């Protein structure tokens, strides 16, 4: 019998496929390996199934997006967990997550964790050092990013109400509190929680596998923590598109290929002067643009040597 469904779990070469309320254990045909393809959690598939025997995946549907770490496809939205402390909050890292998700066409949501620990802070905030130790700092960040168009949450209850009917992944810096949050809102996941290493200031990776869980009328999955974020934005137009507020304003720039760095009549730089764009966002745009240019220059030098 041929059926259609979605992979909800992958383990040791076996794939659990949900179809019409039933879950079937399947394996992939060998021809996928020959084609360099591999089914992943989230894939919509066509599979065969016989009574009292495992099924076989016959066809993988086209993916609207996918992640490599972990291997997961067809994601609607992602919750970026950013902690206030241990690890310390970073606007630069937040913007890098946002660039990553915008480029993947995954709707981002921001959840700020460990706000309760701010009361234990004795030092004040220092904008020059980019430290944020007061609740008012995060209220301002929430307001700033909501003006851009992002959803920002301080509590799990409001976050959960946005999960219905969606496939959602949870991601963030290692130790930011992803597992703690997921165990709070979906205790059936029973994820292992790792403490943050005091010596390195980084968390141990505690997420070992990927599996969809039903929650609030949607499907959710955890992802491993990231010590660093690898993104696939390799050119200025893609980077421009990954900053929604810059993309909107850039249409008014005098030059079509404006990089928003040195060109005259740049609408983005004018908006920056008028405080219509966050300085931190613009600085992070410039930093990533510089990294893209450096990577391209390095590649060109290697190619010339080889050629």
Swiss-Prot record:
Keywords: Cytoplasm, GTP-binding, Hydrolase, Metal-binding, Nucleotide-binding, Ribosome biogenesis, RNA-binding, rRNA-binding, Zinc. GO terms for biological process: ribosomal small subunit biogenesis. Binds 1 zinc ion per subunit. Residues 64-229 form the CP-type G domain. GO terms for molecular function: GTP binding; GTPase activity; metal ion binding; rRNA binding. Zn(2+) binds at residues 253, 258, 260, 266. Its EC number is 3.6.1.-. The keyword Zinc applies. One of its GO terms (cellular component) is cytoplasm. Pfam families: RsgA_GTPase (PF03193), RsgA_N (PF16745). It is an enzyme of class 3 (hydrolase). Coiled coil: none annotated. CDD domains: S1_YloQ_GTPase, YjeQ_EngC. GTP binds at residues 113-116, 172-180. Disulfide bonds: none annotated. It is found in: Cytoplasm. Its cofactor is Zn(2+). One of several proteins that assist in the late maturation steps of the functional core of the 30S ribosomal subunit. Helps release RbfA from mature subunits. May play a role in the assembly of ribosomal proteins into the subunit. Circularly permuted GTPase that catalyzes slow GTP hydrolysis, GTPase activity is stimulated by the 30S ribosomal subunit. Monomer. Associates with 30S ribosomal subunit, binds 16S rRNA. Belongs to the TRAFAC class YlqF/YawG GTPase family. RsgA subfamily. NCBIfam families: ribosome small subunit-dependent GTPase A (TIGR00157). This is Small ribosomal subunit biogenesis GTPase RsgA. It comes from Lactococcus lactis subsp. lactis (strain IL1403) (Streptococcus lactis).
């Amino acid at each position: 019998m041929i059926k259609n469904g979605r992979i909800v779990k992958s383990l040791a070469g076996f794939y659990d496929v949900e179809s019409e309320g039933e879950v079937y254990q399947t394996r992939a045909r060998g021809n996928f390996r020959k084609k360099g393809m591999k089914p992943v959690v989230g894939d919509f598939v066509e599979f065969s199934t016989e009574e009292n025997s495992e099924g076989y995946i016959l066809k993988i549907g086209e993916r609207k997006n996918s992640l490599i770490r972990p291997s997961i496809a067809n994601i609607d939205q992602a919750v970026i967990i950013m902690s206030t402390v241990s690890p310390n909050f970073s606007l630069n890292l937040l913007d890098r997550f946002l660039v990553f998700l915008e480029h993947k066409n995954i709707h981002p949501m921001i959840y700020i964790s460990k706000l309760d620990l701010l009361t234990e802070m004795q030092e004040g905030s220092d904008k020059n050092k980019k430290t944020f130790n007061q609740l008012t700092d995060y209220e301002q960040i929430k307001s700033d990013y909501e003006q851009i168009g992002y959803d920002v949450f301080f509590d799990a209850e409001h976050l959960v109400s946005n999960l219905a009917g969606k496939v959602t992944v949870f991601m963030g810096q290692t130790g930011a509190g992803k597992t703690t949050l997921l165990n709070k809102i979906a205790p059936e996941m029973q994820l292992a929680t790792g403490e943050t290493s005091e010596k390195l200031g980084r968390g141990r990776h505690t997420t070992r596998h990927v599996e969809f869980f039903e929650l609030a009328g949607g499907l959710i999955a955890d992802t491993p923590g990231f010590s660093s974020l690898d993104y696939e934005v390799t050119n200025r137009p893609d980077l421009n598109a990954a900053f929604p507020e810059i993309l909107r304003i850039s249409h008014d720039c005098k030059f079509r290929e404006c990089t928003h760095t040195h060109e005259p009549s740049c609408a983005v730089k004018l908006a920056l002067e008028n405080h219509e764009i966050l300085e931190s966002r613009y600085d992070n745009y410039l930093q990533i643009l510089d990294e893209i240019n450096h990577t391209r220059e390095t590649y060109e030098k290697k190619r010339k040597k080889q050629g």
